[in-house]
């Protein structure tokens, strides 16, 4: 089973990716992890990626596609894989298709921007332990304090409203067009496309995914 997850940052993809991996025995391929692993392995592609990143440039689509192809040929991808954070643009989706990388399901997590802002901006973190709270959905027992240690909670830079809104604008400009792209692919019989209501409780989203994926 080969799956692509689409949806804005904060739409709940990460939580559900864990569930899909465990239930269906497939691995998650995150382009960030893949690039780091390739650089560490010192492979030919890894060296190319390192040179580009060391120069402060963005890794080209061609190189990422080559890395994806190399990664999915590995043994642990036998049952399938889950692509997270790729493709981000239509040229990347086209390049994947040209490289012969077929996908069984494209799942879109649909959540309105304002709810995403609410979800992310309300997060509070206990830096030392990694415990995450939410002022509305999962508040600490004492406001602003970690339940276990009583230490101060902080807001990550990535979780500040300005940053979140900027990421949403980028998502709508670059990645949202993929929704139309993959709907057309599904109409042509090349993949299956499903829209998931990401505003629901985690367990309800999970139940929807089980219905879709079987």
Swiss-Prot record:
Metabolic or biological pathway: Purine metabolism; AMP biosynthesis via salvage pathway; AMP from ADP: step 1/1
Main enzyme class: transferase
Keywords of this entry: ATP-binding, Cytoplasm, Kinase, Nucleotide biosynthesis, Nucleotide-binding, Transferase
GO MF entry, a single one: ATP binding
CDD domains listed in its UniProt record: ADK (cd01428)
Catalytic activity from the UniProt record: AMP + ATP = 2 ADP
GO biological process terms, semicolon-separated: AMP salvage
Principal location listed in the UniProt entry: cytoplasm
Record localization: Cytoplasm
Region ranges (NMP): 30-59
This enzyme's EC code(s): 2.7.4.3
UniProt-annotated binding residues for ATP: 10-15, 123, 132-133, 200
Gene Ontology cellular component annotations, sorted alphabetically: cytoplasm
Residues that, per the record, bind AMP: 31, 36, 57-59, 85-88, 92, 156, 167
Stretches the record annotates as LID: 122-159
UniProt function note: Catalyzes the reversible transfer of the terminal phosphate group between ATP and AMP. Plays an important role in cellular energy homeostasis and in adenine nucleotide metabolism.
Subunit: Monomer.
Family: Belongs to the adenylate kinase family.
Stored NCBIfam families: adk (TIGR01351), PRK00279.1-1 (NF001379), PRK00279.1-2 (NF001380), PRK00279.1-3 (NF001381), PRK14527.1 (NF011100)
Domain notes: Consists of three domains, a large central CORE domain and two small peripheral domains, NMPbind and LID, which undergo movements during catalysis. The LID domain closes over the site of phosphoryl transfer upon ATP binding. Assembling and dissambling the active center during each catalytic cycle provides an effective means to prevent ATP hydrolysis.
Name of this chain's protein: Adenylate kinase
Upper lineage: Bacteria, Pseudomonadati, Pseudomonadota, Gammaproteobacteria, Enterobacterales
Gene (UniProt): adk
